[in-house]
UniProtKB/Swiss-Prot annotation:
A GO-annotated cellular component: cytoplasm
Name this protein carries in UniProt: Sulfur carrier protein FdhD
Main location: cytoplasm
Family statement: Belongs to the FdhD family.
Length: 281
């Protein structure tokens, strides 16, 4: 077996000495575990939120979080001035237009201690349960494309392969070719990083779909819809509120996506199953 010291250690992984018990034997070995640290979002010099996250792809995180939370509407409205890392954490120095900074004053609160957040800084139920503009997309994929993306995602999670402790989010084109993957200890963070990566690469998110290695919560559905991703597929189940949001926002929401199997909860017209629709056997 290859030891951690002979493998490439990514910023998202750290080496720890552990006591491993396996097959009736015990040994002290070096093992890789997922890195996690507080990441502070600082807009125009004023702290807004602190998120527990994996210290990789932090510029993508800054942009994706800002877009999915509605802090800015367009990537060009934001500039990451600096990504500063310290022994105890990291800070993202972000510049946004003055009117956007003023709006943040109504939402500001510290979120220290959470691995991701999809309803950050909202002070009312109405603000949390907002519905983004309805998605109008002609995207249609077949079940083979979904299966292809799922298979490709499995092979493109280096931190998960090393540690077994992170989530991943991927974007694939209509043929199921995975173009971007991002990982993080927080499922919301992984999706935010993906959204940021799409924006930085100037990829039109509406021309493909997203796959996540987690459940599909309300926050995940909201972030996908806010980013204009027309189809979100999760390997686990969605929540009832996520389904309601997806129905209202025009988002195709899929759960239990594994190989060629899945459950479509909303707007099924975007997934061609290649079979006649009838009663379950």
């Amino acid at each position: 077996m290859t030891s951690p010291s002979s493998r490439s250690v990514r910023p998202g992984s750290v080496v720890r000495t552990v006591r491993r018990h396996r097959g009736g034997r015990s040994a002290t070995v070096q093992d890789m575990v997922a890195a996690e640290m507080p990441v502070a979002f600082i807009y125009n010099g004023v702290p807004f939120a602190v998120m527990m996250a994996t210290p990789e792809d932090l510029e993508d995180f800054a942009l994706g979080f800002s877009l999915s939370e509605g802090i800015v509407d367009h990537a060009q409205d934001l500039r990451v001035i600096a990504v500063e890392t310290f022994l105890e954490g990291a800070s993202l120095q972000i510049e946004i237009p003055p009117e956007r900074a003023a709006a943040l004053d109504q939402r500001r609160r510290n979120l220290d201690g959470r691995s991701g957040c999809g309803v950050c800084g909202n002070e009312s139920i109405e603000a949390v349960l907002r519905v983004p503009p309805v998605l109008h997309s002609s995207l249609q994929i077949d079940v083979d494309a979904l299966a292809h993306a799922l298979d490709a995602l499995h092979a493109r999670q280096p931190i998960a392969a090393q540690t077994g402790a992170v989530h991943a989010a991927a974007w694939a084109d209509a043929q199921g070719n995975v173009q971007l993957v991002r990982e993080d200890v927080g499922r919301h963070n992984a999706l935010d990083k993906l959204i940021g990566a799409l924006a930085r690469a100037r990829i039109d998110a509406s021309h493909g779909f997203a796959v996540v290695t987690s459940r599909a919560s309300y926050e995940m559905a909201m972030k996908a819809a806010q980013a204009r991703i027309p189809l979100l597929a999760a390997i686990s189940a969605p929540t009832a509120l996520a389904i309601s949001l997806a129905e209202s926002a025009g988002l195709t929401l899929i759960g239990f996506a594994r190989d060629h199997d899945c459950v479509v909860y909303s707007h099924p017209q975007r997934l061609d199953l290649g079979v006649a629709v009838g009663e379950p056997a």
